[in-house]
Regions:
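Membrane-embedded alpha-helical bundles that constitute the cytochrome b-like, heme-associated redox core
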Residues: 1-223
């Protein structure tokens, strides 16, 4: 769009979280499949920090990162679906209602992966999560089974997420990947929105990063 102003929708910290999580999930799958469990555990600890960061960032970050900006009420979701079925799509400043549900589901699956992985024990008791010593062998085995099931659920959710992105591009000519890379969209998509809405606060960023390191330190020292 020639001459348009491009507004910052996704701050750099949120984008870094997003793509780091993508890479970590792929790498952790590979390490688990190939038995590289030392690295699997290390990357799991990084994911602990990332999720702690996301929780704090969802409370104190810019508008589009905050949980309070998410529209997930039945009226918002059903109204959005009706518009899509009618062929009406207006880009949202942040997550649209369906995108919000997708993010919540994926984050929940990631938390389930991390939570069970920390306590999981393999069938021979040779490999285990960093907190496995805090629970019985039977509980560790149950955690391992849930860990595997929840990963399959996570893969299904990621598949649906990617399929939705492709559908938006195909049916509505709306590229949702580019803004998650550059952070910006044309301001004309949103109307009158303050350009400062998605900018970083370095103090708040420092607090969120500190929370991430605190979570990693706490987990690594709890076992």
């Amino acid at each position: 769009m020639a001459g348009s102003t491009r507004i910052l929708v996704w701050d750099g910290a949120l984008r870094l979280f997003h793509w780091s999580a993508v890479l970590l999930v792929a790498a952790m799958w590979w390490t688990a499949e190939n038995g590289v469990m030392d690295w699997h555990r290390r990357m799991g600890m990084i994911l602990v920090g990332l999720l702690a960061f996301r929780i704090v960032w969802g409370l104190i970050g810019p508008q589009t990162a905050r949980f309070g900006s998410w529209r997930i009420g039945p009226a918002a979701v059903l109204g959005y679906i009706r518009n899509l079925r009618s062929g009406v799509h207006k880009p949202s400043f942040g997550h649209n209602p369906m995108g919000t549900l997708s993010v919540i589901a994926i984050l929940a699956a990631l938390f389930m992966q991390v939570g069970t992985g920390l306590f999981a024990v393999d069938v021979d008791g040779l490999e285990s999560g960093p907190l496995a010593t805090l629970v019985s062998f039977e509980a560790g085995r149950q955690a391992a089974e849930i860990h595997e099931i929840s990963f399959n659920i996570l893969l299904a959710l990621i598949g649906l997420h990617v399929a939705a992105i492709v559908a938006y591009l195909f049916f509505f000519k709306d590229n949702l990947v580019r803004p998650m890379v550059t952070g910006r969209r044309a301001s004309e998509d949103f109307g009158n929105v303050s350009l400062s809405d998605a900018k970083l606060s370095w103090l708040r960023l420092a607090i969120a990063v500190a929370a991430a390191f605190a979570a990693m330190w706490g987990v690594s020292n709890a076992g």
